[in-house]
Amino acid sequence: MRAWIFFLLCLAGRALAAPQQEALPDETEVVEETVAEVAEVPVGANPVQVEVGEFDDGAEETEEEVVAENPCQNHHCKHGKVCELDENNTPMCVCQDPTSCPAPIGEFEKVCSNDNKTFDSSCHFFATKCTLEGTKKGHKLHLDYIGPCKYIPPCLDSELTEFPLRMRDWLKNVLVTLYERDEDNNLLTEKQKLRVKKIHENEKRLEAGDHPVELLARDFEKNYNMYIFPVHWQFGQLDQHPIDGYLSHTELAPLRAPLIPMEHCTTRFFETCDLDNDKYIALDEWAGCFGIKEKDIDKDLVI
């Protein structure tokens, strides 16, 4: 447990900028496990707070003012596409040739798709996905997790019940760590700081550590109120493109992609959260998955 917490706290990436959503896909195929890239970021950073662009396969191209010397300079394309000029010297986004992607430095750059195929890097994956645009295969193809594909064992019912215990505790600890280190870093808003301050100053708070699930379960019962805000906060961190009260597959990716290799119940957990099977996870579904009572689910806590 300690290993995956450390990994998540060290994750880094590039910018999340996807203005359109992608629903949760059907994930019936067998997928496999991996080791993910670790980069230098502030200790305590949430993987969805740092900028993670590896997972935005739903982003649209955005056009800005064309610079005369280089029309492509301010013409941004989504992952898998590059800017080229047409016969009128107008910039346009075209699919990137996978062979033009930088050579991977090591295994940590590899990614696994949901059809269980390993790609040398996210660049290779998105370039390949782009060439399949408009096809059924391309629509279903997603980046599943970071690292080369490996066998991921089935998630047993008993293991599934343990997953939210660890996840809840981790969310609380991430917030406390951000609060402790947030002097001039603007890691939290003032409203968020006020909420977390109460948790931080509570003497009954279970300190971060590799605790047995029995202790985590007891702590949730005894200190239930400490967990309400962290669960809402994480939903807000994920619900960004667009901010609509629902989590799509693309919005979940920054959290689930690094988790899957280390927590094999990740995919099944998020699937069970989607109670109405509409391929999106609403706030009430998300909070319910973490054991938050219906009366305590409040959209105003998503700040």
UniProtKB/Swiss-Prot annotation:
Disulfide bonds join C72-C83, C77-C93, C95-C130, C101-C123, C112-C149, C155-C265, C273-C289. It is found in: Secreted, Extracellular space, Extracellular matrix, Basement membrane. GO terms for cellular component: basement membrane; extracellular space. Glycans are attached at N116. Gene3D superfamilies: 3.30.60.30, EF-hand. Residues 261-296 form the EF-hand domain. Residues 89-151 form the Kazal-like domain. Residues 71-93 form the Follistatin-like domain. SUPFAM superfamilies: EF-hand, EGF/Laminin, Kazal-type serine protease inhibitors. GO terms for biological process: regulation of synapse organization; semicircular canal morphogenesis. Residues 1-17 form the signal peptide. It comes from the Eukaryota. Its main location: secreted. Keywords: Basement membrane, Calcium, Copper, Disulfide bond, Extracellular matrix, Glycoprotein, Metal-binding, Secreted, Signal. Ca(2+) binds at D274, D276, D278, Y280, E285. Coiled coil: none annotated. Appears to regulate cell growth through interactions with the extracellular matrix and cytokines. Binds calcium and copper, several types of collagen, albumin, thrombospondin, PDGF and cell membranes. There are two calcium binding sites; an acidic domain that binds 5 to 8 Ca(2+) with a low affinity and an EF-hand loop that binds a Ca(2+) ion with a high affinity. This is SPARC. It comes from Bos taurus (Bovine). The lineage of its organism: Eukaryota, Metazoa, Chordata, Craniata, Vertebrata. The gene is SPARC.
